[in-house]
């Protein structure tokens, strides 16, 4: 299954690539990791955008999952082939990045029109949208 996590809330400022997470964004990232762990999701690999807010989200999320995130420049912005990036990395691969790119990737794989909120998670399995979690659901699962 392919899991897509949009980065948590980020601070304003520029340059865009260096915007860090806010305290709320850090909380969202930790909760995402705890929620995936409680759901029994065993992430085999994590690929993240190199932009600071996404890399921080991946690091904090993966602490709970026991996985070391790897930076993937193709997730830094613009269209990408999520399935090609995840190919050969294991059964459950977590991608961490940005919108509208992630919502467009979900649409490309499933035909579903979604809008991932900051800190939100979508999971796609063989062309089907299997999971779509907003931060409120993630928080409830993680607690």
Task: Report the location of each language-model feature.
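A glycine-rich beta-strand to alpha-helix segment
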Residues: 91-108
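Short, charged, surface-exposed secondary-structure boundary motifs
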Residues: 79-83, 124-127
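Short, surface-exposed amphipathic charged segments that create phosphate/polyanion-binding patches used
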Residues: 84-90, 128-131
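Active-site-proximal alpha-helix that buttresses catalytic centers in soluble enzyme cores
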Residues: 1-79, 87-88, 102, 112-120, ...
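Domain-level recognition of soluble alpha/beta enzyme cores
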Residues: 110-143
């Amino acid at each position: 299954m392919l899991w897509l996590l949009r980065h948590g809330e980020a601070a304003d400022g520029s340059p865009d690539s260096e915007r860090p997470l806010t305290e709320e964004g850090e909380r969202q990232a930790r909760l995402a990791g705890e929620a995936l762990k409680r759901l029994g999701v065993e992430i085999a690999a994590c690929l993240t955008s190199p932009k600071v807010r996404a890399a921080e989200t991946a690091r904090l999320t993966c602490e709970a999952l026991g996985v070391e995130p790897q930076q993937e420049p193709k997730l830094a912005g613009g269209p990408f082939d999520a399935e090609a990036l995840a190919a050969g990395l294991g059964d459950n691969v977590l991608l961490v990045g940005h919108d509208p790119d992630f919502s467009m990737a979900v649409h490309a794989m499933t035909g579903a029109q979604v809008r991932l909120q900051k800190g939100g998670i979508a999971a796609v399995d063989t062309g089907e949208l299997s999971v779509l979690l907003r931060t409120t659901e993630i928080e409830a699962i993680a607690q």
